[in-house]
């Protein structure tokens, strides 16, 4: 399980059915937490924290969730982080 997989899974589980902006926002929240000293410094560690995100390693994210995860650096900040 790689970092991209962890990010795509949480985007898929938290924001499937949401418009693209909602999916981007979920990814940005995760990345903001990775950058914060208050949270672990890896994507997988952030999304695996108890009671923070819907995260389940047995789920397979959609291709669209991978696309959102890969494209995060190219989107404007939607969450103020």
Feature names for model-found ranges:
Residues 1-81:
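Bacterial extracytoplasmic/cell-wall-associated proteins, especially those involved in peptidoglycan
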């Amino acid at each position: 399980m790689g970092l991209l997989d962890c990010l795509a899974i949480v985007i898929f589980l938290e924001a499937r059915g949401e418009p693209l902006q909602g999916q981007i926002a979920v990814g940005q929240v995760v990345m903001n937490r990775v950058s914060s000293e208050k949270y672990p410094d890896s994507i997988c560690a952030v999304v695996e924290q108890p009671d923070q995100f819907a995260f389940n390693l047995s789920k397979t994210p959609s291709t669209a969730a991978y696309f959102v995860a890969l494209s995060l650096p190219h989107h404007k900040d939607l969450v103020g982080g």
